[in-house]
Amino acid sequence: MDREQLREIQSRRLVKMAEYVYHNTPFYRKKFQEMGLEPGDIKSIDDIVKLPFTNKLDLRDNYPFGLAAVPMSQIVRIHASSGTTGKPVVVLYTRKDLAMWAEAISRAFTAYGAGKEDIFQVAYGYGLFTGGLGAHDGATNIGASVIPISSGNTQKQMTLMHDFGTTILCCTPSYAMFLGEAMKECEWPREDFKLKIGVFGAEPWTEKMRVKLEESLGIKAYDIYGLSEVAGPGVGYECQCQNGTHLNEDYFYPEILDPNTGEPLPEGTFVELTFTHLTKEGMPLLRYRTHDLTALHYEKCECGRTLVRMDRILGRCDDMLIIRGVNVFPSQIEDVILKLREISRSEERRVGKECRS
């Protein structure tokens, strides 16, 4: 599909979404009225700049179901964040939403070269966290076998990985680093494992970390991007060219904005990423501010896909440190640490009164 055709789809869906949220979500109807905006004012994707922003505080202020656009009788799944810094952020899915999400993750898995002959070991956490069930549904959607082991119990992870012939591992990159160390120490040589692909997400990781993961596990390591508020894993994914993260922009429309002014900025500028749902029924969000810092690129990828590509997430607006006038992100510190061959894993710890909650 060329960019012009994609833009036509995005325009049709945005026009429909503006009508949908106005008539089904009191929160957005009030926002529209305060701005003097009518659904009919949205005529194409170019008009997205007229729509109001949404942020995490809006979700918490409307906890638990204040942003629902359908009756709870139509909601078939509820996910939520841990709520470590306040009320949990609740996300609602209809049956159609789950099918869309599974399709989005399926695109990622097929881009990595996965198929129905593969055995997925899903070591993301299951439960309120979106990672486990999201990866599970995406794998079953392409007809693959799934080991729903969830996270933890490393010895059992290694045993099942060996005995069941796992070919694809899904987990956080930090846990994958731990599994890589465990593989060195387990009773079987690495050659006895059938692992070939790692799908890593739910936390930022660097190219240096990719190299270490591929060396320790004997795999090709791929990034998968997502956030619970938008859908979960599968919002974006790498292809085999690994030249950026393709965003499923027919479902989730991305913008890059100045984090201070909220103004859109040109392609290639490293700024804040926002998403607008184009098809979601249960709890659609308009211009949701992720606070993730990245850049977008619209030229066609070598793989043939025309979906926009996103640079690796540099960090979050609220994670940035200013050290002697220089902007520094945790990912940059990790990149330096991982250059030391003596270090296989690292973690961030915050100490001090201001970190207590």
What is the role of each PLM region?
Residues 1-80, 85-103, 107-111, 115:
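Nucleotide 5′-phosphate-binding alpha/beta core
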Residues 116-117, 195:
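Phosphate-coordination loops involved in phosphoryl transfer and adenosine-cofactor binding
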Residues 110-114, 138, 189-190:
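Glycine-rich helix-loop-beta junction characteristic of Rossmann-like nucleotide cofactor-binding loops
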Residues 79-82, 121-123, 127, 222, ...:
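Short glycine- and Lys/Arg-enriched binding-loop motifs that mark or flank ligand-binding interfaces
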Residues 117-118, 268:
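Beta-strand-connecting loops/turns
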Residues 88, 117, 318-320:
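Short, solvent-exposed beta-strand edge segments and adjacent coil->beta transition regions
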Residues 1-5, 12-22, 26, 142-357:
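Active-site glycine/GP-rich loop and adjacent strand/helix microenvironment
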Residues 94-108, 119-178:
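AMP-binding/adenylate-forming
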